[in-house]
Amino acid sequence: MICRWIAFNSSKVSRSLSPFSSLLFTKSSFSVAKMDDESLPTTNSTSDHRGFYKEILFGMKKIGFREFLHGYHFRGLVSELRHVHVEEIMDELMSESSDLSVWFFKELRDIYAFRHSSFSTLLVSHVLAGQRRFKELQVILEQLLQEEGTLCELLSNSFRKWESTGLVWDMLLFLSSRLRMVDDSLYILKKMKDQNLNVSTQSYNSVLYHFRETDKMWDVYKEIKDKNEHTYSTVVDGLCRQQKLEDAVLFLRTSEWKDIGPSVVSFNSIMSGYCKLGFVDMAKSFFCTVLKCGLVPSVYSHNILINGLCLVGSIAEALELASDMNKHGVEPDSVTYNILAKGFHLLGMISGAWEVIRDMLDKGLSPDVITYTILLCGQCQLGNIDMGLVLLKDMLSRGFELNSIIPCSVMLSGLCKTGRIDEALSLFNQMKADGLSPDLVAYSIVIHGLCKLGKFDMALWLYDEMCDKRILPNSRTHGALLLGLCQKGMLLEARSLLDSLISSGETLDIVLYNIVIDGYAKSGCIEEALELFKVVIETGITPSVATFNSLIYGYCKTQNIAEARKILDVIKLYGLAPSVVSYTTLMDAYANCGNTKSIDELRREMKAEGIPPTNVTYSVIFKGLCRGWKHENCNHVLRERIFEKCKQGLRDMESEGIPPDQITYNTIIQYLCRVKHLSGAFVFLEIMKSRNLDASSATYNILIDSLCVYGYIRKADSFIYSLQEQNVSLSKFAYTTLIKAHCVKGDPEMAVKLFHQLLHRGFNVSIRDYSAVINRLCRRHLVNESKFFFCLMLSQGISPDLDICEVMIKSDELLSWTIKWGLLPD
């Protein structure tokens, strides 16, 4: 059989189709139903295969090729059809016409989903190659490669003498490299060399492309005889991907290019390489070189440079380049606008991103999933979750389906971070209903959000669901569960989960241990933290600085500062360096007990180790500085000394390039107020404003409370009035503090005035606020004023409680009045 196929293919004598081959188009009037009544030779399951395929051939001769294959009789035979039968039939058909054999192959495959043997597939492949039907050849061989592999031995042994075998080998090489079948492509290349078969430049380029990021690229390159533009461009791209940009430029100038000349594609690779490394100016110079060489930069060329400019923050230059694209005969595409929108997003300029998208729509371009993802990221980053949901709804209304996990994950993250877990779960379920399977990232986001809110039952249910779907949870997923349990104080449950992960044999990183150790430390369970630390060491896992920082915090929380100090030395024994958190945590413990000497020692040690302090570090230093002085023994000289040290501390911060923030100033102001240096506190308030830092309500609360505590009520009134003139929003605490101070000082008129302001500004006034005022007025025997506030409370729909009634009853002058109103308690 094989010999006859080889003889047919090797013969150069053209054959005319025999009458048998015309059966494909003849006897069209023959009734298929009538065929069932004809006497056809039949076979049973015990018949030999030769009789079986003869029955099929007889049927095709009797009624016509097409009619028989589509008839009911053949449909009944298909289930018994085997590879050997098909090969015998194709043998007969090949002797008449190769077209018939190919057609029979396709009919069985397409109509009856018959899975052909590798031999039949290679046979048809050789026929198609001989007829230069390369697209069909590619489809057939690609499927064969994916299902069976290269089958080099079968190809070598059975089809060596076919004239078209070189084309089949070449196509196999091309497809195997394109399908990233590395070992197969190299083996095919070796077999082709052994048989002296010609390898096309296209196939060589495909192999070269696959190895472009390795040194193997040069071995393939040297074997290519007829190099073309694609060959050179692939080498340049490979060198750029290997970050060998100087070699790429040198190769670009090589003499091998003299006949072809460099292409825009090669310049694009070099520009992209420089942009990825942040050397945008170099990329711009090559863009100019493209123009000097008489080449026309493509849209992709512009997009590379625009993206590079956006990544380094040169958004204005990127916009200018985009507007000049039409000068080079190209127009910005949706990718261009997406890059610009992302550039604005990276700078936090979401309004600019919206302007770019509006321009995009004006140009008649439609936003894609990437566009929406960029806008969603921007809105969620700014906390505009509702706007993000509007964008998602608009995306769906434009016909986009939830077929991309990225925008959904962005939205899920935004919802979970703002505590809107019910909406996150709704979106999560909608994704599944629309056929979009959540991935590991999506599951981890929702599980983390549920754990933050303490909804562990739902979190564990989702955890089990993802495991059932064979989505393996990673450290982030486990970390979310452990962190949530620790934050809720469920340390036993957290330890149980960690132990189950350890016993499962799964490789755990130090992060998971750190979460539980930190949970123990923050709860003051230092012994349990140390016990788990021993487990870490015994397991052979290297602890991190975060591990030791948690232990330092735990010791400090339990007032064992001496042991916490020793941890700094232990860190170094493990080849690690203490971090700024290590020192700041220990400094805070010393600050709480006013040990400024130890704080100074740690500060000097930080400088010696080259560890720069942070705003938090300096806030702790200021706290220690102020607490180091006994408040009751603080005379004017000591206050001035503290004041000057605070000013020097600010100068030190600025000299180290650390701009003081609100917390720093609030810390200084608070402790200056505690030592009764109010003038100094107001000086720092002015310094704060001069640094363009807006004082928070906490800052004003500290100052107003201090003025009232130390009896400077009029100054407090003036201060609040000046703040109101500046349209500064004050907190409820500021008003109630001053109201209570006026009541104590016996100035009910000002208290009434401020209370009206409190109500006018829409604050939620409770019975506790009325009780505080009435209580103080009654103690001062201010009957009418107490009565006024009592009536005001009733007018606001607030009923008095037992405490208020008792206070008013104790005032003799109010007793009869309370009885009159029927408010005497039982």
Curated annotation (Swiss-Prot):
InterPro entries: Pentatricopeptide_rpt (IPR002885), PPR-containing_protein (IPR050667), TPR-like_helical_dom_sf (IPR011990)
SUPFAM superfamilies: HCP-like
Ranges of the PPR repeats in the UniProt entry: 228-262, 263-297, 298-332, 333-367, 368-402, 404-438, 439-473, 474-508, 509-543, 544-578, 579-613, 614-648, 661-695, 696-730, 731-765, 766-800
Keywords noted in UniProt: Repeat
Pfam families linked: PPR, PPR_2
Family indicated by similarity: Belongs to the PPR family. P subfamily.
PANTHER family per the UniProt record, alphabetical: MEMBRANE-ASSOCIATED SALT-INDUCIBLE PROTEIN-LIKE, OS03G0201400 PROTEIN
NCBIfam families hit by this protein: PPR
Protein known as: Putative pentatricopeptide repeat-containing protein At1g13630
